[in-house]
Amino acid sequence: MAVLCFVAVCAGQANKPFPVVSTVDQPEIAGRPVQLDAQGKLLPWPMPDNIGYSYSSHVLTQWQILWDQYNRQRLPYYYCCFDFDRTTFEMFPDEHWANSTGYLRAMLQGFIERLYPYTGDARMLVFLQDFVDYELENGLTPQGYAWPQVPYASANPGAKRYTGWSAHGEDYIEPHVVGEDGYAYLRLYEMTGNTKYLQAAIRCADALVKNFKPGDEKNSPWPVRCYARDGKADGGPMGPYSANVIEPIMLFDELMRIGRGNVADYERIRAGAWDWFQKYPLVTNTWVGYFEDVSPRMTNMNQVIPLEFARYVLLHPEKDPQWREHARKLIEWVKTTPKWPKYIVHGATVTTEQGDGLEFCCNEPNQCCDSHTSRLAAVEALYYAKTGDESYREAAFRSYNWVTYFQGLSGGAHTPFGPQWWFTDQYADGPRRLMDAFWAVPEWAPADESHLLGSSSVVTKISYGKGSITYSTFDPQSIDVLRLDFAPASVSAAGKLLSVRKDLDAPGFVFDESTHVLRIRHDSEKDIDIQGNAGQAPPLYITFDDPHLPAGTELQGQYPSGVIDWGSGEWQIGVPQGKFGTFNLSLADASATTAKFSFYSPRIFVGVDVYNGGSEAAVVTVHSPEIREMSCTLKPGELQRIRTGWRDPSSSVIFDLKNGGKLRFDNLAYRRD
């Protein structure tokens, strides 16, 4: 994670006071020009007038890179930090820093838990299970240890077997990561029904029970880091204190809720950990002991622990009678603590990661690290959703807008000591917390698409159709939030019609005609069916990232296999640039005035995203032998999502172009019927 830069940054910044909050209105964020409203406030990237497109583009772009890595290099299995060639945009690893094995799994589970129901893309479950399975097979402590069969928190860079980072020692674990990873295993069990993940979660919980101690002001119930064999936390990189007992508590709470494992033990230890948390960190604000690659210090505070606690009690206010006060105070503490600097970037609050008042991580706000600001925005958005305080919605909106500039392969994102960046931040932790935006403020989701945005239960399966969504939840009792591109004619739970209501004080649904936001409460059934008139079947997309082809490759014949014939030499793969953060499509001949492709069997051409990187307006006219033409004009620097409105299949699609030499195309959308 971003903390790898802590030592390097500190060496240059020791004993140099910094302002707690400063304004940094730079013209670029992560190398991308800022986009502002009439008041000079930050708008999202890449489409400033379309929040839904920009936010959705962020999470889907990060997923495309995850899927590409799964299919090719699998670098995140072995490394934490990466750079890419600025010509080919091919990724390569940093060979020197710890691999963040444990909480990377937990963060990716949290991301995919939300992204899968948002898209219905079952490949996400394939990816996540394989990634977690690798840890279960190559990253657990041995039987017979004081901490048996639990995940190590880190590994040496490039190591195929995880046993901890040798810069800190050998054969050690971090108990809070055992809780965090254990919770992820448990939620993955709920997603898939595979009991090996349940058993892995129970092993984590049982180890936490076995090694619990009451704690005091200087000793937490579990150490921040200890040797796995005997549990000792003496000296050096080991340490007795971590404020992060919340993720072990989350694991206990969920096992207790579903009645699995040694529930009586979990209740007892959970109560002890909660009491300690209320008595010490929540009073003293000693928020230390999270990151896997720094040595413990009681003065080095971080924002992860207080914000993740605030998020948990906002989602589960029944756990904490003082949830409102605690969440508000912790948000304020993160934004005002003198331990590390905060920045105002065109009205967006940007937080760095950690610090002690003199030394901090990391560098200037428009270079890294998006995940921490994404977390702050998530908690503020959820606070707005629970309280209705509009000031928190506005703050979350501006901070989330800043986060969107880091999507894809952003050439200006880097550490303070080199061009590489952190996979954990940009492709796991950051996007999982941006997913909270849709749940908290459904109006920020795309208005012209249908998506399940959030549920109080894990969603186990989902299918999107024309004017329909069917899905199942792990729990029979749940409240679900969706945004639709159609109006529901009926909503049923296990075949029983739910009634229209003005609120969710009882089972039923509330539909907002103006925003098309649908909220459903079901108390006794898992299978939900939504049917309506109009709407469109979700299209299939060609992203030009899957399967991967090197930049500059001229398309010859079919790509992907059996879908489109691109002819011979009219089109080529382009690198991420302009307002596209991943690989895309361009003309092989910049002077061409026409180009075409053919479907292997007739398909409905829905449209494509087009960016004009030229200095003149470009005109794109699209037609086919079967269907009339449609045309659009793109100003210099403009990105448009072109939608044809065609309802009939085409055998081929022709593009007539004026000033088309700098056009880029991505996310080609089509339907089978």
Label the model's feature ranges.
Residues 627-673:
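Terminal, low-complexity interaction segments
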